């Protein structure tokens, strides 16, 4: 769910039943916090890939008259081929004023295709907007998942990716990212993608829930201004300024 001024917007999702069957939804549901009105919009997509799931979407308030929604990653519902994960070389942009989706090409150090990652963003003092993409996985558990313990930032309006420089060690998926103070993003929970102790297809996913979280209390802080992890939360934080790598991108173009 994302906030659009006085509106809350929920795109896609699932409906299910007691048998465990799920059906993907294609509509955009908007709730107006002022009028208490709920609107179900059917909006045409931007490609023929079909329905997408397990990706991330964030509201960007400082572009367009009503802001924009930026959607990325995840996989394609109903597909089992190796290429069902959606690459980050393109993102989908929704214009709520005109109720239209667009597809936007990106450049830079792109994340590996993944799903069940977390996403959060912040407007900088330089009139850009940076979106953090952290963790997630490609559907496989075990040591092959270690590279997914990585953080990438997409800067807008340049639509340019920058990768944070640290050593991957603790991959996770099914977590959340939350902007909690200017440049600080709070990472909450998730399950251990590294664990795959069972050869049984069903039991192997249970292993991911069995290990202690290396983050104290299941919480961690990522600093967007420095593109690095912080040891603690700072209650009084300076206004968010984009990281030097991002400022360099704009200054050299």
State what each model feature region is.
Residues 6-15, 64, 76-80, 126-127, ...:
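Short glycine/acidic-enriched loop and turn motifs that connect beta-strands
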Residues 138-140, 161, 167-172, 182-185, ...:
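Short Gly/Pro-enriched loop/turn and capping motifs at secondary-structure junctions
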Residues 16-36, 82-100, 145-160, 201-228:
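Beta-propeller blade signature
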Residues 47-48, 79-84, 103, 107-110, ...:
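Juxtamembrane/interface segments of multi-pass membrane proteins
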Residues 129-131, 141-148, 161-163, 196-197:
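Extended hydrophobic-aromatic, low-complexity segments
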Residues 1-10, 18-31, 41-76, 85, ...:
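Conserved short beta-strand element of beta-propeller blades
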Residues 39-41, 102-104, 162-164, 230:
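A structural motif specific to WD40 beta-propellers
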């Amino acid at each position: 769910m994302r906030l659009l001024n006085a509106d809350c917007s929920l795109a896609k999702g699932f409906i299910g039943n007691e048998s465990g069957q799920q059906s993907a939804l294609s509509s955009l549901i908007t709730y107006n916090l002022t009028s208490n009105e709920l609107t179900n919009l059917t909006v045409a997509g931007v490609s023929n890939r079909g329905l997408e799931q397990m990706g991330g979407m964030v509201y960007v308030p400082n572009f367009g008259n009503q802001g924009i929604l930026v959607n990325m990653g995840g996989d394609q519902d109903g597909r089992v081929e190796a290429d069902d994960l959606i690459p980050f070389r393109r993102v989908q942009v929704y214009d709520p004023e005109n109720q239209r989706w667009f597809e936007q090409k990106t450049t830079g150090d792109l994340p590996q295709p993944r799903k069940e990652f977390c996403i959060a963003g912040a407007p900088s003092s330089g009139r850009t907007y940076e979106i953090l993409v952290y963790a997630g996985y490609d559907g496989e558990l075990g040591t092959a998942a270690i590279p997914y313990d990585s953080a990438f930032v997409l800067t807008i309006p340049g639509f340019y990716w920058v990768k944070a420089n640290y050593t991957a060690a603790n991959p996770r998926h099914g977590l959340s990212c939350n902007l909690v103070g200017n440049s600080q993003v709070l990472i909450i929970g998730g399950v251990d993608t590294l664990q795959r102790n069972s050869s049984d297809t069903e039991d192997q996913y249970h292993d991911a829930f069995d290990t202690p979280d290396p983050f104290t209390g299941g919480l961690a802080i990522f600093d967007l201004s420095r593109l690095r992890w912080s040891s603690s939360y700072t209650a009084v934080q300076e206004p968010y300024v984009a990281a030097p790598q991002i400022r360099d991108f704009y200054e050299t173009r």
